[in-house]
Amino acid sequence: MITCAPEQVQHSPLPPSSMTRMGTTRRRVLAVGVIGPGRVGSALLEQLRAAQPRLARDSALELKLCGVVASKRMWLDCDDAELNARHGGAQIWRPNDLDAFAGHVRGNDGRHALLIDCSANDEVAAHYPRWLAAGLHVVTPNKLAGSGPLPRWQAIRAACAGGARFRYEATVCAGLPVVQTLRDLLDTGDELFAVHGMFSGTLAWLCNRHDGRQPFSALVREAHALGYTEPDPRDDLSGLDVARKLVILAREAGWPLSLEDVDLEGLVPPALAALSRDDFMQRLDELDAPMAAKLAAARAEGGVLRHVAQLDRHGRASVRLQVLPAAHAFAHTRLTDNIVQFSTRRYCDNPLSVQGPGAGPEVTAAGVFTDLLRIAESLEARA
């Protein structure tokens, strides 16, 4: 089992001197542009700032922040060393223009350039094929590219044929090494039989806490107050976010899956799904009786309720609430843990498991940072 404790995933899993040990002694410069300075983007900017002296000293790597794009404005650097280290109030912002931003980061001097999209915006994801074809590397925790329309995903992969790299580890389970683990298994000739996982920290928390002592609606309200859910809890309860993550893994494994192909059973009935958010919150109690019945049925079988995503060797995918044996690994996770199990030819009797915190800006940003460093490892020093 690969287990990542919170304090572990906040740091890069690549040793500071890994690039130096591999023989790279010439200084390399990577121009970086960040789109979406929200919770994850801001955490990433701080991690980049804090790591820059160590990377320059131990790995001969300089990360040059060339700009930041917010929802309506963008900032472009002015080659000032201090301003280059972080974005802030001293800089001049201008109207948002993604094409101009990408062109600025890429420059015209043959530099290595990388765009990081932390926006969760479908319009931004639509630019990826063009950016990659132009030679810009792209790293993102944005699930809309990997789980969106299949033709766009295929265009993204085709655009990488020119040498640009596209990495998206943080789209599945934040900073946990899920996508890379699957990629490594397949690249070394293993055969994937099945994927099982709990991909939602919110739903894991609700299932772990739902023991009959409180109505399910009270737990949803508590999770909402704690910030565990999206502003509209139905975004979590629907299971759609989990389905997106499963589609991403399926495509990584070679199956041309779309969201419509996932057998998705959410926890919100159609009558409540059609309401406004405020009306839904007022009628949240209507979930109590069906969820209590599901809990009673699970206990009658000697099992527990867990929200599970699964993919079989034929590409069939499902996301639903399931009754699992009390001895099952998914029955013994920490409150908000994500866990993914890969059943393969090599890991058949005892699946390979990846488990740990699957949400939060710090761990998600660390997953993005790890992808950046993996790309940096492959770059040649340029004069």
Question: Locations of the language-model features?
Answer:
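Glycine-rich phosphate-binding loop of nucleotide-binding enzymes
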Residues: 118, 138-141
